[in-house]
Amino acid sequence: MTVVLLVDGDANLVALNKAALVADGHLVTTAANTTEAQAAIGREMPDLVVLEAMLDGATAGFDLARSLARTNPDLPLIMLSRCDEVLSAAQRAAQDRDDGWMPVVRFMEKPVAPDVLVYEVDHAVKAGH
């Protein structure tokens, strides 16, 4: 059973995506912000993290992704966001870009259809990202 950490402040989307992932056989832990995400990871390391780009402020999701990639380089990350938010933050981040500035296996524009998210999670897990 794959353990997925779903990090997003939108409770409605979290509920929909969690239900779809659980129905697909995944064990899902949720967090609404970076503090909750870090606490959840401290309790149990997930097999994959799905996170919103814009947590707790302009770049908190990006910062969390970079931090997780540094400490857990084999942990697959899928990032969700509204396209305009990602582009704006990516432009700001480009000022100090390096090869690991966006260490995610997949960007997905919100709202993501639950079945599409399930497919991407399954694909990332099977690919061994």
For each of these PLM feature ranges, what is it?
Residues N33, T59-D63:
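Acidic catalytic/metal-coordinating carboxylates
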Residues E36-Q38:
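Short alpha-helical segment
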